[in-house]
């Protein structure tokens, strides 16, 4: 008998007014996450493999929720195409996949899909998470898009680094 349930909790798409490489470099860098992710205070114990956010890189998310400190790992990184992380906290796994679709030289669609794997007994109680997660994830991505667009307006030659 299956003891866990995997649930999609969000599938959102946000337009970024920057090149896909710029959006990718910013969103995949763990050290930049607290700038745009509302629930994240900071990252700790960052261990990069190559560039920040490349497959195999890991860190701990220090969240605004007391005692929630998931260990994060990048499991897929294809620059300007796809980035995927998995966070583990106790019996819970959370996966986030970001897909990047260039819409021109300075325009990118970012699709974010989030899944939770939880003990089967917990799954029925996740209705609130499934209702709130898409709104929260879209808001975080809109914040990132706005920050990047403002940065480009201030200095059109500046990259996300």
What do these predicted regions represent?
Residues 9-11, 67-72, 92-97:
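Short, surface-exposed coil-to-beta transition loops
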Residues 16, 63-65, 78, 89-91, ...:
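A generic beta-sheet turn/junction motif
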Residues 51-57:
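A short, glycine/Asx- and small/polar-enriched loop/turn
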Residues 57-64, 83-89:
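Short beta-strand segments that buttress and anchor functional surface loops
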Residues 86-139, 155-157:
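Beta-strand/loop substructures that line and gate deep hydrophobic ligand-binding cavities in soluble
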Residues 17-21, 75-80, 99-109:
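A short, structured loop/turn motif at beta-sheet edges
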Residues 1-51, 161:
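Hydrophobic ligand-binding cavity/cleft-lining segments
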Residues 40-46, 142-161:
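Short, highly charged C-terminal tails/helix-capping segments
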């Amino acid at each position: 008998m299956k003891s866990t349930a995997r649930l999609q909790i969000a599938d959102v798409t946000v337009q970024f007014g920057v090149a896909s490489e710029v959006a990718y470099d910013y969103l995949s860098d763990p050290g930049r996450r607290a700038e745009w992710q509302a629930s994240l205070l900071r990252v700790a114990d960052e261990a990069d493999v190559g560039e920040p956010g490349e497959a195999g890189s890991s860190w701990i998310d220090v969240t605004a929720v007391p005692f929630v400190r998931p260990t994060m790992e990048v499991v897929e990184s294809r620059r300007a195409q796809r980035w995927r992380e998995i966070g583990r906290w106790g019996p819970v796994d959370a996966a986030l996949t970001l897909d990047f679709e260039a819409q021109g030289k300075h325009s990118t669609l970012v699709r974010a899909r989030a899944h939770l794997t939880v003990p089967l007994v917990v799954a029925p109680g996740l209705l609130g998470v499934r209702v709130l997660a898409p709104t929260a994830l879209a808001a975080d991505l809109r914040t990132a898009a706005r920050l990047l667009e403002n940065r480009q307006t201030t200095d059109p030659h500046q990259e996300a680094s």
